[in-house]
UniProtKB/Swiss-Prot annotation:
Origin species: Chaetomium globosum (strain ATCC 6205 / CBS 148.51 / DSM 1962 / NBRC 6347 / NRRL 1970) (Soil fungus)
Start-end of Polar residues biased regions: 73-84
WD repeats: 104-145, 147-187, 191-236, 239-278, 283-342, 344-383, 388-450
Encoding gene, per UniProt annotation: PAC1-1
Protein name as annotated: Nuclear distribution protein PAC1-1
Family, as annotated: Belongs to the WD repeat LIS1/nudF family.
Keyword annotations: Cell cycle, Cell division, Coiled coil, Cytoplasm, Cytoskeleton, Microtubule, Mitosis, Repeat, Transport, WD repeat
Length: 454
């Protein structure tokens, strides 16, 4: 054991063992261990031992959870094409009841995000905490404290092979947490002058990228791009006239879509030194709360809606979706033309996500529902989950697809080779390389996180 652990780690293990034995009334065994290692009552008294109670059990259950996650990832990696086809992931849609209802937050849930590899889900809340769940088991793993006001958004991503969790808050800060080190807060990024409403890791590929870049949106009317390895703000994007609500990077990391209280959405080319809006989307009649960039799998269906005979094949951003307080969803092309208005929600549209298979767009709303819009039927609403939550549905995320190439799976986009829940494919890569996971998470003012899964 001494060869595997440092002297400090061995000492901590011995203390945890003594605390465990003492708390389970195995006093003679605890005394024998004390004598064997020379740890007397004068050095490690009962009061100090109390601090170590439960530590051994916690470490043990963490190892068990990790083993389950490794097995789960291995099973996904080894799944055959036939088994995937039988589950028909391209056509899968969530249905009620949810597989799990996750309860622990004491205030409304504002955001959720999936780990790109493991079955971990992060949720943020007005209770100022982030909670990490095992979405497969439906269990709470830990509670992260650090923000002093509402946690407004969370996202997984970061440098290759080193997944981080980013969070942002009404306390004006962005925080970076290390999942591999018990979610230790490794950096705090100050700089915004008002609440930071959204945060996303930018996929590697953009100049100076390599997965180190993060974009944030704020009530101070700006977007900022950060280098997470240094903590420095490398670019500030100005153009919106009001609060910037949401942000979505393109799969190649070159473009960023933002939404605002100024009733507009803007598409930015962040690969240039001084980014300016490439396209401004004008049409909503109220605050634009959410956005999503369509995956290439959606291009044929959206091109048909737009009246284009041949779907585009080159650009990373050809079609987009935005949701608003005007209760509508708008579909746009890259030129800023609204190609379709989706009407059906009875209240604010809070969240959007494209189905990784490309056929559907899913939305979450303050009308307590989730809606599924079929892009092969010109955006017709083909499914409504009317009992999704008992209050406003504030966020929605799709689990990232499993990418066979681990170097891509741990890429800098924060979603296992995805952006906004849609599969990221390298040039020349086929759809088979990204295995769709039929898992969806939502969060609500009813204090619940819900997991919808196949």
């Amino acid at each position: 054991m001494a060869q595997l652990l440092t002297s400090r780690q061995a000492e901590e293990l011995h203390r945890a063992l003594i605390a465990y034995l003492s708390s389970n009334n195995l006093t003679s065994t605890a005394a024998a261990l004390r004598a064997e290692i020379g740890l007397g009552e004068d050095v490690f008294d009962a009061t100090t031992a109390k601090k170590y109670e439960g530590l051994l059990e916690k470490k043990w259950t963490s190892v068990v959870r990790l083993q389950k996650k490794v097995r789960h990832t291995s099973q996904l990696s080894n799944a055959t094409p036939t088994s995937r086809q039988n589950k028909d992931p391209v056509n899968w849609l969530p249905k009620s009841p949810a597989r799990h209802t996750l309860q622990s937050h004491r205030q409304p849930i504002t955001c959720v995000a999936f780990h790109p590899v493991f079955s971990s889900l992060a949720s943020g809340s007005e209770d100022q905490t982030i909670k990490i769940w095992d979405w497969e088991l439906g269990e709470l793993e830990r509670t992260i404290k650090g923000h002093t006001k509402t946690v407004l958004d969370v996202d997984f991503g970061g440098p290759r092979g080193n997944t981080l969790l980013a969070s942002c808050s009404s306390d004006l800060t962005i925080k970076l947490w290390d999942p591999s080190d018990d979610y230790k807060n490794i950096r705090t990024l100050p700089g915004h002058d008002h609440s930071v409403s959204a945060v996303r890791f930018i996929p590697s590929g953009v100049a100076g990228g390599a997965g180190n870049l993060l974009v944030s949106a704020s009530r101070d009317k700006t977007l900022r791009i950060w280098d997470v390895s240094t903590g420095y703000c490398v670019k500030t994007l100005r153009g919106h006239a009001e609060w910037v609500r949401d942000v979505c990077p393109s799969v190649d990391g070159r473009f960023i879509l933002s939404t605002s209280d100024d009733y507009t959405s803007r598409l930015w080319d962040v690969s240039i030194a001084n980014p300016e809006p490439k396209t401004t989307l004008i049409g909503h009649e109220h605050v634009v709360l959410c956005c999503a960039i369509a995956p290439s799998a959606s291009y044929p269906h959206l091109a048909a809606i737009a009246g284009v005979k041949k779907p585009p094949t080159t650009s990373a951003v050809e079609f987009m979706a935005t949701g608003s307080r005007d209760k509508t969803i708008r579909l746009w092309d890259a030129r800023g033309t609204c190609i379709k208005i989706l009407v059906g929600h009875d209240n604010w549209v809070r969240g959007l996500v494209f189905h990784p298979g490309g056929k559907y767009l899913l939305s979450a709303s303050d009308d307590y529902t989730l809606r599924c819009w079929d892009l092969t039927q010109e955006g017709r609403c083909v499914k409504t989950i009317s009992d999704a939550h008992a209050h406003f549905v504030q966020c929605i995320r799709w689990a990232p697809s499993v990418v066979k190439d681990v170097s891509v799976a741990n890429g800098g986009d924060g979603q296992g080779g995805e952006a906004n829940g849609t599969p990221r494919q390298a040039a020349g890569a086929g759809a088979a390389e990204a295995q769709i996971r039929c898992v969806l998470a939502t969060g609500s003012v009813d204090l619940n996180v819900r997991i919808f899964a196949n």
